[in-house]
Amino acid sequence: MRVFVSSRRVKRWQFFHLFAICFILSFMVFWGPINNYIMSHMKSYSYRYLINSYDFVNDSLSLKHSSVQPHHPYLINHREKCQAQDVLLLLFIKTAPENYERRSAIRKTWGNENYVQSQLNANIKILFALGTPHPLKGKELQKRLIWEDQVYHDIIQQDFTDSFHNLTFKFLLQFGWANTFCPHARFLMTADDDIFIHMPNLIEYLQGLEQVGVRDFWIGHVHRGGPPVRDKSSKYYVPYEMYKWPAYPDYTAGAAYVVSNDVAAKIYEASQTLNSSMYIDDVFMGLCANKVGVVPQDHVFFSGEGKIPYHPCIYEKMITSHGHSQDLQDLWVEATDPKVKDISKGFFGQIYCRLIKIVLLCRLTYRNSYPCRAAFA
């Protein structure tokens, strides 16, 4: 009997020993990248004050007097889009030539100008900004883009290849177009084509800001003290030759952000003086803003690169959510249902929604959507 018990204890210890070894090995394998990630962010954040407060970053990226930004002629344009109109919001949607289905879904939902005019009593202008199809995709796609624009009249296109590494050219397209053809729009917004925008909430928010005449306004999901990615295998790799500093100036996630028209004008002017080889467009925006002294403000209901949890209590105050390439129309119907506002009515409704938001938003896992403090906003 003692031998049997002793044997069980030995097997148990062997199991725990094996488990401990596996745990340690797993920890060693995964801790390296995690530790590097944590340390790089801690290091970059420690430089944040210097990066945001002094001009040495901008000086190192400024164009020489003999240099100019590359010029890309328009292939599709609508210079009359804003003429002689009182425009609350000029909204650019960054899209790829092949993403017709996404553009179509946006036109049927939150990007419908007629809906915003008739139901929300606001005049907004929406344009899809893009470059040219990759040469391997041939001329047929360009022909389809021309046909699409003849139907909807909402595309602007310049003559540069539409690719990830040309996103800053697309940034220059948007702010250049706004500066030339629609400088009087109260606000400028830029968004990805897989974003969801709760247009009723956004319009209500902007109309309130318009009444108080807000200036120096730049809002979105703010990244503070983010480090450049030095891993060559990463999509976001930035070599030292392109950007040598350990941290970026504060910037908003490129998924969606809004600026007032005075900021849009300043950003355009700054963009003409900085080297556009920095192909991460939201970082380039941060560099431009840093040069003219504009500071981003964080809004808890602007999503980062993450998708928000689906629930009516979340929809009540949401403004943007990222990553909706397939479910845009269903989410539009659910989120804009008038019954959503009824859920949080009354004392018990407010308590219920507060608890739901805490459960959905206050998690240890990083979601890059709404922060925990949004549950208490």
UniProtKB/Swiss-Prot annotation:
Pathway: Protein modification; protein glycosylation
Chain ranges on the Lumenal side, renumbered to this chain: 36-377
Catalysed transformations (reactions): a beta-D-Gal-(1->4)-beta-D-Glc-(1<->1)-Cer(d18:1(4E)) + UDP-N-acetyl-alpha-D-glucosamine = a beta-D-GlcNAc-(1->3)-beta-D-Gal-(1->4)-beta-D-Glc-(1<->1)-Cer(d18:1(4E)) + UDP + H(+); a neolactoside nLc4Cer(d18:1(4E)) + UDP-N-acetyl-alpha-D-glucosamine = a neolactoside IV(3)-beta-GlcNAc-nLc4Cer(d18:1(4E)) + UDP + H(+)
Pfam family, one: Galactosyl_T
Keywords, comma-separated and alphabetical: Developmental protein, Glycoprotein, Glycosyltransferase, Golgi apparatus, Lipid metabolism, Membrane, Signal-anchor, Transferase, Transmembrane, Transmembrane helix
Transmembrane segments: 15-35
Protein name per Swiss-Prot or TrEMBL: Lactosylceramide 1,3-N-acetyl-beta-D-glucosaminyltransferase
Biological processes per GO annotation: central nervous system development; lipid metabolic process; protein O-linked glycosylation
Protein family according to the UniProt entry: Belongs to the glycosyltransferase 31 family.
Any one GO molecular function term: lactosylceramide 1,3-N-acetyl-beta-D-glucosaminyltransferase activity
InterPro entries: Glyco_trans_31
Side of membrane Cytoplasmic, spans: 1-14
Subcellular location: Golgi apparatus membrane
Gene Ontology cellular component list: Golgi membrane
Membrane protein topology class: Single-pass type II membrane protein
Purpose: Beta-1,3-N-acetylglucosaminyltransferase that plays a key role in the synthesis of lacto- or neolacto-series carbohydrate chains on glycolipids, notably by participating in biosynthesis of HNK-1 and Lewis X carbohydrate structures. Has strong activity toward lactosylceramide (LacCer) and neolactotetraosylceramide (nLc(4)Cer; paragloboside), resulting in the synthesis of Lc(3)Cer and neolactopentaosylceramide (nLc(5)Cer), respectively. Probably plays a central role in regulating neolacto-series glycolipid synthesis during embryonic development.
Chain positions carrying an annotated carbohydrate: 58
Main location: Golgi
The EC number(s) this enzyme carries: 2.4.1.206
